[in-house]
Design a protein with these regions (language model features):
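Core AdoMet radical
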Residues: 17, 38-84, 99-113, 124-141, ...
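Generic structural signal for hydrophobic
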Residues: 96, 123-124, 148-149, 186, ...
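Flexible mid-to-C-terminal extensions adjoining Fe-S/redox cofactors in radical SAM and related proteins
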Residues: 1-16, 36-72, 305-387
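Radical SAM enzyme [4Fe-4S]-AdoMet core and its adjacent flexible, acidic
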Residues: 21, 41-46, 63, 152-155, ...
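Short cysteine clusters
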Residues: 26, 30-33, 285, 303, ...
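Cysteine-centered iron-sulfur cluster-binding motifs in ferredoxin-type domains/subunits
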Residues: 21-30, 36, 109
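Glycine/alanine-rich phosphate-binding loops at beta-alpha junctions
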Residues: 87, 93
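Distinct, well-ordered alpha-helical segments
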Residues: 116-121, 142-150, 205-213
């Protein structure tokens, strides 16, 4: 009977996109990291791990169990209850069964600790490789055979936002190039690839945007997702890097022109940017309804961007449940989730994260549904009228 109920639900329910930040651990120390990942590196034989704000490092004790520095750092965090064990991650997969899901296995750097490779294999076995996206960085990917990994994922995503400036860079110097170097190998064997480019004050120049597009074109990358810069995670610390509406429009126009000439990568706009090209009947913000975040403690969030500078849920209002402890069926059926989903169209077009950040209501949940996203202050009425 349960199997029949699952089949009936999967035939009618929407696809649930879940970005699963499987670990906080990363080998990079990006200033705008939207999940406030912890930086891990080795120096003079010692493994060091940062706080989410990068303000302090501590030494990871040697537990005698071997592995690379990231494996050691993961076990260190697991011993403190800061990240899920492999058994708990498999319990999450159990609790997703019976639903149409698309899992984006992300981080931190998802593949820096080796146990996550097994997690990807198991997720692909249960849900099918086409339901699995991997978002990773060059160094994380470098430790794995491309063909073997390609057999477990439907798409590879990676961040590529151009060369950082010499002064106050938001990314380490080789971050983007190392990501593309590895992604090129996946594209060469036919794996679907998508570059993700947060638009910031540091990459808006048409020359830089052209360089970004042409490097992706030459590497055979299929898609380029233009993203809004969210002041979440460590991005809270650099609000001046967020472009204006006109800067966003100009950047999109530049890349659309290149797309028209070269055909690929295909330019896609993240939900938060689509209304800049005109009104749409479908609500571009699908937070809480079809798009969710899942953090490294198993907490299901109403948006993948609901993370603060400490790498924690941005506010209890965004917390929907814990997938280690409860099934997705139970969480989606809760009074809180049903209430929030019923209100999703109230601020059509507005990004619910920006509405929450800029709203004036005393209640956090109320702010999520306000028409207070500053990007749409001049176009929200038109967009809402098209709904």
């Amino acid at each position: 009977m349960a199997a029949l109920q699952d089949m009936s639900r999967m035939a009618t329910e929407p696809l649930r996109d879940i970005i699963w930040n499987t670990t906080a651990i990363c080998g990079w120390n990006c200033g705008t990291c939207c999940v406030a990942a912890t930086h891990v590196h080795q120096r003079k034989g010692k493994v060091l791990i940062s706080t989410p704000t990068l303000s302090r490092y501590e030494e990871v004790p040697d537990d005698g169990m071997g592995g690379n520095p990231f494996d050691r750092a993961l076990r260190f965090r697991q011993s403190r209850g800061l990240e899920l064990t492999l058994e708990q991650k498999l319990a999450v997969l159990d609790h997703l069964s019976g639903h149409r899901v698309r899992l984006d296995i992300s981080g931190g750097d998802a593949l820096s600790p080796r146990e996550n490779y097994f997690l990807i294999e198991e997720a692909a076995r249960r849900f099918g490789k086409d339901a699995i996206t991997l978002t990773a960085t060059g160094p994380g990917l470098a430790h794995y055979d491309v063909a073997s990994l390609a057999g477990t994922i439907g798409e590879l995503n990676f961040t590529f936002d151009g060369p950082p400036p010499d002064v106050d860079p938001l990314r380490p110097a080789t971050y983007a190039t190392s990501n593309l170097q590895r992604a090129r190998k996946f594209a060469a064997i036919g794996v679907s690839t998508r570059a993700e480019c947060p638009l910031t004050a540091q990459n808006l120049d048409p020359t830089v945007l052209t360089q970004i597009y042409m490097q992706l074109h030459d590497a055979g990358i299929d898609k380029l997702l233009l993203m809004r810069l969210f002041p979440v995670g460590r991005g809270e610390l650099v609000p001046d890097a967020v472009p204006t509406n006109e800067q966003y429009r100009a950047a999109i126009a530049t890349l659309r022109s290149l797309e028209a000439k070269y055909r690929f990568p295909e330019v896609k706009l993240q939900c938060a940017l689509r209304l800049l090209e005109g009104p749409t009947r479908a609500n571009p913000c699908d937070a809480v309804v079809e798009s969710f975040g899942l953090n490294w403690e198993g907490v299901l969030l109403g948006s993948p961007w609901a993370i603060n500078r400490a790498g924690r849920p941005a506010d209890p209002a965004w917390v929907l449940g814990n997938l280690v402890e409860s099934s997705l069926t139970e969480i989606l059926g809760s009074e809180k989730v049903r209430r929030m989903q019923s209100r999703a169209a109230e601020n059509h077009g507005h990004c619910k994260i920006f509405s929450w950040l800029n709203g004036s209501s005393p209640g956090s949940e109320e702010r999520i549904f306000e028409t207070s996203d500053p990007m749409y202050s001049d176009i929200a009425d038109t967009a809402g009228g098209a709904a």
